[in-house]
Regions:
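A short helix->loop->beta-strand "cap" motif at the edges of active sites that frequently abuts
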Residues: 18-20, 116-118, 176-179
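Active-site cleft segment of glycoside hydrolase catalytic domains centered on the general acid/base Glu
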Residues: 5-6, 34-141, 145-147, 159-169, ...
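N-terminal carbohydrate-binding/catalytic regions of secreted carbohydrate-active enzymes
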Residues: 1-17, 21
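Hydrophobic faces of well-ordered beta-strands that scaffold small-molecule active sites
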Residues: 22-26, 75-79, 120-122, 148-152, ...
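Substrate-binding cleft of secreted/luminal carbohydrate-active enzymes
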Residues: 154-157, 179-195
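Short glycine-enriched loops at secondary-structure junctions
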Residues: 26-32, 80-82, 186
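Glycine-rich, aromatic-flanked loop segments that form ligand/cofactor-binding clefts
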Residues: 15-33
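Anion (oxyanion) recognition and catalysis
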Residues: 16, 112, 174
């Protein structure tokens, strides 16, 4: 199925009715966005940086307002998904941290306009890679709006040992003073190939 606004709203209303909170995750893409692909929505394909900034703001604010008006219990918003290599490529691809911050800041400002009490998470992959987190957040925090939570993905097959994850989490919690969330995780029973 699709996770367009209509479908996502129906799911979020059911989740709220069941007594749960909703983490609203903006991918800013027509398809799943991750470190290997951060493709701009087709309708934004020809936009420059300023137009992309405005589109992120408008889409985020309109979506937030739609969810809030429907009574959805949004308990956290994630601006972008696994942003290790940026978002809205090619304009927002690492190492262009100025544009990355421009786009993420637009999303954060829109969340704050809709409801300033909802915490914002910025999420990277590769939770065991401390150098990645330091480079990314050192660059973003020089240019970025304030946010509350750093999200990490942790898949041990790709992202290192639990000790590496632990060391990274301890370092970035102290370095940036943010709460941490493991936003994606999968722990296999075995690392052996199926025979």
């Amino acid at each position: 199925g699709e996770n367009d606004l209509k479908t996502s709203l129906e799911i979020a209303k059911r989740v709220t009715a069941a007594g749960f909170g909703v983490l609203l995750n903006f991918h800013y893409s027509d398809f799943w966005a991750d470190p290997g692909k951060q493709i701009k929505p087709k309708t934004w394909a020809d936009y420059g940086v300023k137009e992309l900034e405005q589109a992120v703001y408008d889409y985020t604010l309109e979506s937030m307002q739609t969810f809030l008006d429907a009574g959805v219990n949004i308990t956290m918003v994630q601006v972008g998904n696994e942003l290790s290599n940026g978002l809205l490529w090619p304009e927002g691809k690492v190492p262009n941290y100025d544009n990355i911050a421009t786009f993420v800041n637009a999303g954060i400002r829109a969340v704050r306009k809709a409801d300033a009490t909802i915490p914002v998470m910025i999420h990277l992959d590769n939770g065991g890679n401390n150098a990645l987190y330091r480079e990314w957040f050192d660059n973003f925090t020089k240019r970025g709006e304030d946010f509350e939570i750093i999200g990490l993905s942790y898949y041990p097959f790709w992202h290192g040992s639990l000790q590496m994850l632990n060391d990274n989490m301890n370092d970035i919690a102290e370095r940036y003073g943010k709460d941490l969330v493991i936003a994606e995780v999968s722990m296999g029973y075995t690392m052996e190939d199926y025979k």
